[in-house]
Amino acid sequence: MKKLHLGCWHRDFPDFINVDLLDMPHIHYKSNINELPFFGNSEIDLIYCSHAFEYFDLVEAKDVLKEWKRVLKTNGVLRLAVPNFEALVEIYKRTNNINKVLGPLYGRMEINEGKNTLFHKT
């Protein structure tokens, strides 16, 4: 089974091919996750992407999903994890602290590749 972990950052799962923009020892392909030219059509059984998809805007997201579909086998699985809006509302109601929810909703992540900063597009 061929499994991809897209936008893996520091997480290294056994038996996954890791793709991320950052250069870390466990990264197999240092690349953006919106284009996967190093994989052929219908080559991948499983794509896992946790808290990276929200960095694409609506137009980009459509193209990204097309690309991921291209590399997935016909019965392949796409597993996405994105911010849980309902959970964030509950946190706000419980704490009354807007700063606890702004990061996950409109967060930013600075990366060590030049002057790059990634912002959520949600």
Describe these PLM feature segments.
Residues M1, I44, K73-N75:
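A general structural motif
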Residues K2-P37, E86:
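Class I SAM-dependent methyltransferase SAM/SAH-binding core
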Residues I17, Y29, Y48, L78-A81:
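Conserved Rossmann-like nucleotide-binding pocket used by diverse enzymes
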Residues N34-I47:
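A short acidic, Gly/Pro-enriched loop at the edge of an enzyme's catalytic core
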Residues L46-A52, A61:
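A short beta-strand submotif of the Rossmann-like class I SAM-dependent methyltransferase core
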Residues E60-K73, V77-T122:
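S-adenosyl-L-methionine-dependent methyltransferase catalytic module, highlighting the catalytic core
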